Amino acid sequence: MSDPAQEVEAPVEAAPVASSPKGKKEKAPKAPKAEKPKSDKPKKPKAAPTHPPVSEMVVNAITTLKERGGSSLIAIKKFVAAQYKVDVEKLVPFIKKFLKASVAKGTLLQAKGKGASGSFKLPPAAKKVDKPKKAPAAPKPKSTNKRVTGEKKVVKKPAAKKPEAKKATKAAKPAAKKVAAKPAAKKAAAPKPKPAAKPKKEVKPKEEAKPKKAAAKPAKPAAKPAKKPAAKKAK
């Protein structure tokens, strides 16, 4: 008989679990996130500012206050709040930024202090630019008046040409006189028919005396009829 201790079977070794490379655990693939639908609500338009730019407000405050030692930040804030009716505390960072940048550029002068805590004023050149100078523009129309007078002189020069027209009229008048003289010549030729008055001369007392001679000499009356043709020549 066999020994029962020998008949006991050896325990079966468990197969080793396959390990992932580099000892890392495999992550399950994530499901893609569903995109959120975009809202169709229209964006609200930005409200238009009810005040001018900060730079304009600060410069206006400094020019209006006209402080010899310059305007401080507190004075500028009070002026802006009273003039433009805005929340100055919200604008303080922008005011300080503008003051520092303007001092660096030279558009503002810092009379006292450092940074934005001092007092500020405009440079002399900027004050001259701000003053409007419209007075020199007034004399300009005078030069235009001179040009107009010069044009008038040019207009007067053509008036000197009028004597030429007079000469033309004078030259036309002698021609008219010549035309008028021609009828006078015709009138001078008209008196030619006056010789018709000659027959009056023929009626002379001498002719009346001739019959007396005929009475004395009866033989001569035969010759008188021959003298009648002489009267035709007078016509």
Swiss-Prot record:
GO terms for molecular function: double-stranded DNA binding; nucleosomal DNA binding; structural constituent of chromatin. One of its GO terms (biological process) is nucleosome assembly. Residues 1-21, 181-191 have a biased composition (Low complexity). The keyword Calcium does not apply. Pfam families: Linker_histone. It is found in: Nucleus; Chromosome. CDD domains: H15 (cd00073). Its main location: nucleus. Residues 225-235 have a biased composition (Basic residues). GO terms for cellular component: nucleosome; nucleus. Residues 26-42, 199-211 have a biased composition (Basic and acidic residues). Residues 1-56, 112-235 are annotated as: Disordered. Keywords: Chromosome, DNA-binding, Nucleus. SUPFAM superfamilies: Winged helix' DNA-binding domain. Residues 50-124 form the H15 domain. Belongs to the histone H1/H5 family. Histones H1 are necessary for the condensation of nucleosome chains into higher-order structures. This is Histone H1E. It comes from Chironomus pallidivittatus (Midge).
